[in-house]
């Protein structure tokens, strides 16, 4: 299953991370709908709002079905046929949608038949592993392996500054397949909401949980899932299956409480360290990077700050783990990522909203 995610990037940075090629091969950025409803967070739970990619054709009849927009949607699909005046009165859970019953339940079958396919965006998602012999559960943060890419431009004068701006060379967002619907409230306002499709876990995650989100790995998979005008439902459903191209690390139990919204939620934790260590040099640099990517605001449950102004972490970079977490290229990427200073300054702009 998938019941908690992180999506902390400011709006303008998130937009750059979603750059894509249109049918003519031009590099483009998706446009926003209801941008003010987007709230970055390290700890998103059901019924909160998350950014979702979908085809522009859902809103503009003359649009190309391959064109994309981003819209914040409520997590937990509210069917269009729901009769109550309050969506919180929905009696069944629509946070996730099992791939094996997607064509059996009206809540999902109807919007899927209308082509209401979307891609849920996140840094990654959290999952909890039950510790043997205890009632405790260890949280993990799960995401795409991160590989540093070359920036565009080089010595090619034909590359405009606009195209360079549309090339993303940092954290790769997790792209999860979803279904959305539009419920019309008694007052006439439409509520857009979604459900994340889940599949059996891949081998690498099966020790943590038996289910995982249906992850769309690569631009082609994302394009086919979104383009309901060209790709039929049955063809699109072939994209829904477990993938192995993921990595993970344990994180602090601070993420257990959905009210906690700090960088510590996704910071790697050392399971062998019982004593709370102070932030080391690498973790401080990661904290500084994360701080530039999200709007600054005071959170009641934020950890206390030391003299340097940085929160004291109860975690540090993963050294050993009882599970075979994939490190390799991702570890190398993170090492280089942490050393970035001035290269990241252009991406540290605050959102316009």
Swiss-Prot record:
The modification Thiazolidine linkage to a ring-opened DNA abasic site is found at residue 2. Its main location: nucleus. The keyword DNA-binding applies. One of its GO terms (molecular function) is single-stranded DNA binding. The active site is at 2 (nucleophile), 127. It comes from the Eukaryota. GO terms for biological process: DNA damage response; double-strand break repair via alternative nonhomologous end joining; interstrand cross-link repair; positive regulation of isotype switching; protein-DNA covalent cross-linking repair; proteolysis; somatic hypermutation of immunoglobulin genes. The record marks 209 as: Required to stabilize abasic sites. The modification Phosphoserine is found at residues 160, 294, 321. It is found in: Chromosome. A motif (PIP-box) lies at residues 332-338. The record marks 127 as: Required for sensing abasic sites. Residues 292-353 are annotated as: Disordered. Residues 295-307, 336-353 have a biased composition (Basic and acidic residues). GO terms for cellular component: replication fork. InterPro entries: SRAP, SRAP-like. Keywords: Autocatalytic cleavage, Chromosome, Covalent protein-DNA linkage, DNA damage, DNA-binding, Hydrolase, Isopeptide bond, Lyase, Phosphoprotein, Protease, Ubl conjugation. Expressed in embryonic stem cells. Sensor of abasic sites in single-stranded DNA (ssDNA) required to preserve genome integrity by promoting error-free repair of abasic sites. Acts as an enzyme that recognizes and binds abasic sites in ssDNA at replication forks and chemically modifies the lesion by forming a covalent cross-link with DNA: forms a stable thiazolidine linkage between a ring-opened abasic site and the alpha-amino and sulfhydryl substituents of its N-terminal catalytic cysteine residue. Interacts (via PIP-box motif) with PCNA. This is Abasic site processing protein HMCES.
